[in-house]
Amino acid sequence: VGSEMCIRDSCNELSVKYGYEKLTFLEGDIADYEGVDQVDMVVTLHACDTATDYALAKAVGWHAKVILSVPCCQHEINGQIENDVLKPILKHGLLKERFSAIVTDALRAEYLEREGYEVQVLEFIDMEHTPKNILIRAIDIGKKGKNSKRIKDCEAFLNVEPTLGRLLGMQKD
């Protein structure tokens, strides 16, 4: 599910060409998508800001066996993060942006572990090609993580409430 019709059409043609009849690409907003009850694998590629969170929440809800997510811009945490101890980092826009991106993806990995996934955060392509080269790879192992307190402590320390936590019911725990 994505917003670029030309990419959707091209990807659908490739899936037919290579015999992947059950692989489909749709145009739309992932937050509103209700087309299936279960999927085997969810792949996100540069889903901007909280679109990644909506896709990850859908993947968890579908009990996807595999999640491959390449996040894009991580603006949400950048707009929320506050901490006097970290002022030397947060007072500089560029450093705050990069730190916020790392925090965002680290918390995403923690949420996925909490939901029963084994998670790796990897660099999947050389920095010379794109600075957005982080892959969050998650494999469903069916065993919920016991890291809720660690997540809550981190969020409280940074004064953040990420969308993925809300979507997965973390703020209620």
Label the model's feature ranges.
Residues 1-7:
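Short, small-residue-biased leader/transition segments that mark boundaries at the very start
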Residues 10-173:
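Class I S-adenosyl-L-methionine
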